[in-house]
Amino acid sequence: MTPKQYKYKAFISYSHQDKKWGDWLHRALETYRVPKGLVGKETGAGVVPKRLFPIFRDREELPTSHELGRVINKALDDSSHLIVICSPRSAKSQWVNEEIKQFKRLGKSDNILCLIVDGEPNASDKPGLEEEECFPEAAKYEIGEDGELSTIRTEPIAADAREGKDGKRNALLK
């Protein structure tokens, strides 16, 4: 079976308070050149392209529209991967949480990648550190048959761009 062809290589989900990270990631991904030895190789996700283009980011892609929810849902459906910029701000963002839930409802849970830029993973499990949580709730739980978050925990796939961790460059390569 031929893998689905997507309009976007990825959809970047982030809190607008993390706009500088969204700008950086969008630019870095769209200008990234895939190593020549990988280009053209057949994988389970299709043929490896020369560039990771286009990437959906709301400020870049969205027209001024009163039907924002419909446009966002269409873009999520048209995206191969969802990249979530994780920080205490995104962990509290209703929009980021909804985008993750919708992507999971589309059956693409395995294609969610997290980029930690601030805060602590799973801090909400530690009394007194709840405000430092960087993962949105929807990133930490599976979607149930009813389309809502279940009580079954999942471990997000994450690169860590924080200083002293992977750093920006290594996190991008991951």
What is the role of each PLM region?
Residues 1-30, 60-79, 88-94, 101-174:
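C-terminal interaction surface of TIR/SEFIR-family domains
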Residues 31-54, 131-144:
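Short mixed-charge
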Residues 55-58, 86:
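Short, basic, glycine/proline-bearing loop/turn elements
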Residues 82-83:
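Hydrophobic acceptor-binding patch used for acceptor engagement in glycosyltransferases
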